């Protein structure tokens, strides 16, 4: 039986479920027992990538593969999905275990992003791809419109790599300094070393990839400040 709170939330996301149990599963973090949302998250990751790729393909008829790929990565990255979750007040609806609830899991980017993917999968399973497209794409409209057409900004690692390659210098070396937290609340610290420049920066994030991007961003900032 779906709660009145969850029932009201369906109006906020713009879709009323035929099978409300799918929404409840999408909102249940693994710390709260089963059935939780990890399988839905897996499916939702593929669905949202398809929807965004399709939207970009149609909107940017002259963009090359690289530009389309970078734009999609920008739109479906963890921080972007977490921003959508906050706009929809998704964190308030999450079903968390006592530990996650106490540690503020409903505010954590990784948990929010995973929940968005799970909700997308739930809509897809409850209806079909066409309905999912109609419901979900408006969530991304502001971010889609804000992207510079055909030329989305490259991520920090790509920008740093291209800057070094243009000068025929060695590529940066990323090393894990430490990781902490349980499997669902990981925190990573990574270093980025530029040999020829004797420059070393550090970055943090909820995944190693995000920590590397953060470290690369700090390196770019230092290079810019030394110009």
Swiss-Prot record:
Q: Where is the DRBM domain?
A: 155-225
Cofactor(s) named in the record: Mg(2+)
Which SUPFAM superfamilies does the UniProt entry name for this protein? dsRNA-binding domain-like (SSF54768), RNase III domain-like (SSF69065)
Domain RNase III residues, every copy: 6-128
GO CC terms in record = cytoplasm
Localization per record: Cytoplasm
GO aspect biological process, one term: mRNA processing
The protein's annotated catalytic reaction(s) are: Endonucleolytic cleavage to 5'-phosphomonoester
Q: Which Pfam families match?
A: dsrm, Ribonucleas_3_3
Q: Where in the sequence is the active site?
A: 45, 117
Q: Which SMART domains match?
A: DSRM, RIBOc
PROSITE patterns named in the record: DS_RBD, RNASE_3_1, RNASE_3_2
Where's it mainly located? cytoplasm
Biased composition, class Basic and acidic residues, residue ranges = 203-212
Residues that, per the record, bind Mg(2+): 41, 114, 117
The record's region (Disordered) falls at: 203-227
Stated EC number for the protein is: 3.1.26.3
Q: Which key words are in the record? A: Cytoplasm, Endonuclease, Hydrolase, Magnesium, Metal-binding, mRNA processing, Nuclease, RNA-binding, rRNA processing, rRNA-binding, tRNA processing
Quote one Gene Ontology molecular function term: rRNA binding
Q: Which family does it belong to?
A: Belongs to the ribonuclease III family.
Q: What does this protein do?
A: Digests double-stranded RNA. Involved in the processing of primary rRNA transcript to yield the immediate precursors to the large and small rRNAs (23S and 16S). Processes some mRNAs, and tRNAs when they are encoded in the rRNA operon. Processes pre-crRNA and tracrRNA of type II CRISPR loci if present in the organism.
| Complex formation | Homodimer.
Its recorded name reads Ribonuclease 3
Q: Which organism is it from?
A: Xylella fastidiosa (strain M12)
